[in-house]
C-alpha cells in the first residue's frame, strides 16, 4: 500500500513539474500575441505565422517522429548505458542525414520559388528538430525538472529576443523566426550540458538494427502529428 502511495505521489510530482514547463511556454506565447499584432505589419505577421505552421507540418517528416521513439526507448534503457548510447547515436546519425536532405531540398525549392526568409526558415526547422529530440531525451532519462527548466529557458528567451528585435530594433516579422532559433539553441545547450548527452554519441555505438527497430515504432506516428496542423495550412 505504501509503495502504491509512493508511486502515485511520484506520478503527481512529475506531472506537475512537466505541467509547469509547458504552461510557462504557452503563457509566454499568449503574451507575445499582442506584441505581434501591435508592432508587426499584418501581412508580415501572417506570412511568418504560416511559415511556422508549415514547419510544424514538415517537422515530423524531417525527424521521422524519432522524438517519440527516443522517449519510448530511453524509458527502458535508463540504467543501461550501452543501449542508451546505441539509441542516442543511431538517432543522431539519422537526424544529421535528414538535415542534409532538408538542406538539399530547400536549396532546390528556393532556386525555383525564391522563398522569403529561407535561411531563417531552414535554421528554425533544424533547431526545432534538435530541441524536440533533446527535450524528449531528457524526459526519457527521467529528468523532468531539467525538462521543465529547458522549456522555461526556451520560453523566456523567445520573449526577450522578440521584445529586443521587434520593439527596440524594428526588425519585423523575421524576428519571430530568429527568436525561435535562438531559444531552441539555448534549450539544446542547456540540456546538453546538464545531461552530458554528447558523451553518449560514439562512432562504435551506431546500430543499424536498433535504428530500424525505432523507425518501425516512430514512422507510423507521422500522420498523427501532421493532421494536427494540416487544417490550419488549408
Residue ranges and their predicted role:
Residues 119, 149-197:
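Hydrophobic alpha-helical transmembrane segments
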Residues 18, 22, 49-52, 91, ...:
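Residue-level recognition of transmembrane alpha-helices
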Residues 10-64, 154-159, 219-234:
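Signature of the first transmembrane helix
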Residues 73-76, 128-151:
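Membrane-interface junctions at transmembrane-helix termini in multi-pass inner-membrane proteins
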Residues 13-25, 51, 56-110:
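Membrane-water interface segments that mark the loop-to-transmembrane alpha-helix transition
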Residues 1-11, 119, 145, 173-177, ...:
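Interhelical loop/hinge segments that connect adjacent transmembrane helices in multipass membrane
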Residues 70, 135-140, 144, 166, ...:
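C-terminal transmembrane helix end/exit motif
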Amino acid at each position: 500500500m505504501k509503495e502504491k502511495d509512493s508511486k502515485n505521489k511520484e506520478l503527481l510530482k512529475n506531472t506537475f513539474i512537466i505541467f509547469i514547463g509547458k504552461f510557462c511556454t504557452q503563457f509566454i506565447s499568449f503574451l507575445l500575441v499582442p506584441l505581434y499584432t501591435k508592432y508587426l505589419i499584418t501581412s508580415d505577421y501572417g506570412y511568418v505565422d504560416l511559415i511556422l505552421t508549415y514547419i510544424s507540418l514538415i517537422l515530423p517528416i524531417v525527424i521521422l517522429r524519432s522524438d517519440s521513439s527516443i522517449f519510448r526507448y530511453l524509458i527502458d534503457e535508463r540504467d543501461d548505458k550501452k543501449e542508451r548510447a546505441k539509441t542516442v547515436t543511431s538517432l543522431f546519425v539519422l537526424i544529421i542525414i535528414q538535415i542534409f536532405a532538408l538542406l538539399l531540398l530547400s536549396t532546390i525549392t528556393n532556386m525555383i520559388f525564391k522563398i522569403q526568409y529561407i535561411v531563417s526558415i531552414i535554421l528554425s526547422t533544424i533547431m526545432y528538430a534538435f530541441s524536440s529530440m533533446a527535450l524528449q531525451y531528457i524526459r526519457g532519462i527521467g529528468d523532468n525538472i531539467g525538462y521543465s527548466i529547458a522549456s522555461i529557458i526556451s520560453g523566456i528567451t523567445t520573449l526577450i529576443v522578440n521584445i529586443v528585435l521587434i520593439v527596440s530594433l524594428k526588425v519585423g516579422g523575421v524576428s519571430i523566426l530568429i527568436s525561435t532559433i535562438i531559444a531552441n539553441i539555448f534549450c539544446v545547450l542547456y540540456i546538453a550540458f546538464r545531461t552530458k548527452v554528447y558523451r553518449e554519441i560514439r562512432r562504435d555505438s551506431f546500430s543499424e538494427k536498433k535504428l530500424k527497430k525505432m523507425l518501425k515504432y516512430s514512422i507510423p506516428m507521422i500522420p498523427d502529428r501532421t493532421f494536427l496542423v494540416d487544417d490550419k495550412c488549408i
